[in-house]
Regions:
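Polytopic transmembrane helical bundles with strong interfacial aromatic enrichment
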Residues: 1-152
Length: 152
């Protein structure tokens, strides 16, 4: 029970860090890059940090989520219940978030290495916007998974 609580807490903390990082970069930092109001080196460091957070979180969430799924679900409950469907939806959204952040950060960093800012930001824009939308969707699904059962 203590291990499960610790895993759940760490899983939630990493998920919050990842989703929050994606939203911060997408909403606060990326518009500055689009306007040319941030130095390419600073933008590159921020995007590199987002990429590291994404990779670490994706790995940790895969492991901790796998533990939670293995101890709390069966194949039948994952595929045959609304809660199981939410868990599978979350897995798909995590994969989409990792992919969009990786694609966006690769495009941003490619141009930043050439000391450019507006063009790489423009190239990364659709991916970072999609990542922000996916991060919000993940928070919604997490809220639905965390709701108390009906009747409580």
């Amino acid at each position: 029970m203590v291990v499960d609580t610790a895993v759940y807490t760490a899983h939630t903390a990493f998920a919050a860090l990842w989703a929050g990082s994606v939203l911060f970069v997408g909403v606060a930092v990326h518009p500055l890059a689009m306007a040319g109001d941030i130095a390419p080196a600073a933008y590159g460091r921020i995007v590199s940090t987002l990429r590291r957070v994404t990779r670490a979180s994706a790995l940790f969430l895969f492991l901790s989520g796998g533990h939670m799924a293995a101890t709390g679900y069966t194949v039948e409950s994952l595929t045959g219940s609304s809660t199981g469907h939410l868990v599978l939806t979350m897995l798909g959204l995590w994969l989409a978030l990792a992919a969009t952040v990786e694609a966006g950060s690769a495009r941003a960093l490619r141009g930043v290495e050439q000391r450019k800012i507006r063009e790489p930001a423009r190239d990364a824009r659709p991916f970072l916007r999609a990542a922000a939308v996916v991060a919000v969707a993940l928070l919604v699904v997490a809220g639905l998974l965390g709701r108390p059962p009906a009747g409580l």
